[in-house]
Amino acid sequence: IDPMDGTLPFIRKEPGYSVSIALVAKDGSPQIGVVYDPVYDVLWQATRGQGVRRNGELWTLDASSQELTFTYDRSFVDRPERDRVLQTLEDYAHSIGLKKLVVTQFGGAVINACHALENSPGCHFKFSKPQEGGGSLWDYAATACLYEEAGAVVSDVHGDPLDLNRPDSTFMNHRGAVYATDQGLAERIREILAQSE
């Protein structure tokens, strides 16, 4: 349970915070994911094998947009490879026939992932790093369930499932996170992240 993901947007009285609740199996697989965005009154729900609901209605990915959405958090702004990553994403968008890349700093990890899912094709990712910090399993568990049930892609930077039941730490920094609305986009993101390791 993360009763307040996106503390900074909340303190600033800006959109981008949420309540996030998940149930994770012993093997680390997300079973239930619930996210509530109180600013826009949106409730996302997913249960393994039962799809995704948005405000009580069954919801499916709509990849008809002509724009690629990339949501990022504060840590991305100071990354030395920021400009290269943005250019690579823009080039990828054009290569698959999209008109442009839309870049948004929206809020906490939970809302960033939801925003990318809702604005398909979209993505949100976190670089891996050796030092602890930068997100815990409760920042990723609910949205991992949403993505899996929507048929989208969620993984670590190497393409493996997120380590949501890590015995030695709640932090996810060691393997990063990739959220993408389709497999091709996820693969491109993993290539970008591999160049930064």
Where are these regions (language model features)?
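DPxDG-like acidic metal-binding loop motif
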Residues: 1-53
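Short loop segments at secondary-structure junctions
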Residues: 24-28, 39, 48-51, 57, ...
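A generic local secondary-structure boundary/capping motif
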Residues: 34, 58-62
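Short small/polar-residue motifs
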Residues: 40-44, 55-58, 162, 167
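A short secondary-structure junction signal
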Residues: 44-47, 56, 81-85
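An extended, acidic
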Residues: 62-197
